[in-house]
Amino acid sequence: MRIVFMGTPDFSVPCLQALIDDGHDVCAVFTQPDKPKGRHGVLTPPPVKELALKYDIPVYQPKTLKTDEAKELFKSLNADLAIVVAYGKILPGEFIHAPKYGCINMHASLLPKLRGAAPIQWSIITGEKRTGVTSMQMDEGLDTGDMLISKSVEIGENETAEELHDRLSSLGSEVMRETIAELQAGNLHPVKQDNEKSTYAPILTKELSKIDWNDTAQHIHDKIRGLYSWPGASGEIDGKVIKIHLSRLAGACSGKPGEIIESGKRLVVSCGDGNAVEILVLQAPGKRAMPVQDFLRGNPIEKGAFFE
């Protein structure tokens, strides 16, 4: 099958690798433009581009898909199918309808839940117990197309967004392979999404980082896990913004919201529902992240102090 692949970050790589391994004719890869990275702003290609070049697959990196030039280029590829995995751009209708079998997207949620840019992180932040990957026949809406195949996984009680990302990235290639096989066999049965059951997973911003210690311990723990490793959850103490990378639930307590009720071998903070979270890894401004005991040796926090 002649396939155009559209994807950008690490999450997309297993799907492209699977297409190559399965012997499909990947006639082109569309990915985001190279971006400056690091202290010196070195122009760095996306992970998908690096893999494509390794296999001599033509790579296209248009800044926009809205130009006639981009639309004509895509149409000229005469693809049977486009596979879209975390590409990072909204596809115009001319792209969606150009391939023989249209465009199929691998979305990292159990649609119609968590449509949008950050479904992995929001599945944890919102306390979901299960999530997964859904293949979807793309239309011109935002993750509103007919569902094809989905597979689900349980979210671990201490699992971070980064860990879940890696699991769903692998699962995505399984869903993609099954979707293509069923498409070729003529066995796909698209199911319309129930819009009344849809939820939204907007892009993450730094403004989400601040922890509200009046919230429940479970919600705070979920936020810390869901925002790991970017933008990261944070709390302010003694005028310093401290990033909190890892935590776990610590049971019932009698402190006030944000109060440090234990400090030394452990760092335990009271939350708004009479339960506490234990902070495991944290980071001072301009420093590296470190385990709590190492952190407290250089940045002592007294029992009875408060996170704001």
What are the residue ranges of the model-derived segments?
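N-terminal beta-loop-helix "entrance" segment that forms/cooperates
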Residues: 35-55
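N-terminal Rossmann-like dinucleotide-binding module
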Residues: 1-39
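Acyl-group handling in specialized metabolite and lipid biosynthesis
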Residues: 202-215
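Donor/substrate-binding cores of folate-linked one-carbon enzymes
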Residues: 22, 32, 81-200, 207
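An anion-binding loop in the catalytic cleft
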Residues: 214-308
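Internal alpha/beta domain cores that form substrate/cofactor-binding pockets in large enzymes
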Residues: 2-4, 27-28, 58-77, 90-108
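Structural motif corresponding to alpha-helix initiation and N-cap regions
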Residues: 13, 42-45, 67-71, 89, ...
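A residue-level signal for conserved active-site and pocket-lining positions in enzyme catalytic cores
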Residues: 7, 29, 52, 82, ...
